[in-house]
């Protein structure tokens, strides 16, 4: 099954690479999935990031097309995760799936246990790059 093109900024990619090298994450299946996403991603500088792309620290509204549920979450690094009702770790399967997608994109993504989900990005309520916050 083909996946939509994803765009990741160089700073996010570097930080995720460092995260994935940590022993706590290196052996996890999600680490392999994130590495594969980084390998296929188009890279750009934070300043060149299109304003409709889900980046780290973006607040994204998305729909689970499997059950129709709509959620709004801020995509964060695990160390910044404080509230699962408002945040989503990039090391969570859904967080990894959303990274780099554009508004309007949808993706099929495998969850733990072999279950698949189908997600659609509806809106970016905040993107650091669009706000000029290039170092978040």
Swiss-Prot record:
InterPro entries: GreA/GreB_C_sf, Rnk, Rnk_N, Tscrpt_elong_fac_GreA/B_C, Tscrpt_elong_fac_GreA/B_fam
GO MF annotation list: DNA binding; RNA polymerase binding
Superkingdom of origin: Bacteria
Phenotype of gene-disrupted mutants: Mutant shows a significant reduction in the level of Ndk.
GO BP term, pick one: DNA-templated transcription elongation
Further remarks about this protein from its record: Can restore alginate synthesis and Ndk activity in the aglQ mutant of P.aeruginosa.
Subunit: Interacts with the RNA polymerase.
Domain notes: Contains a short N-terminal coiled-coil domain and a C-terminal globular domain.
Family, per entry: Belongs to the Rnk family.
Function noted in UniProt: May act as an anti-Gre factor. Regulates the level of the nucleoside diphosphate kinase Ndk.
Protein name per its UniProtKB record: Regulator of nucleoside diphosphate kinase
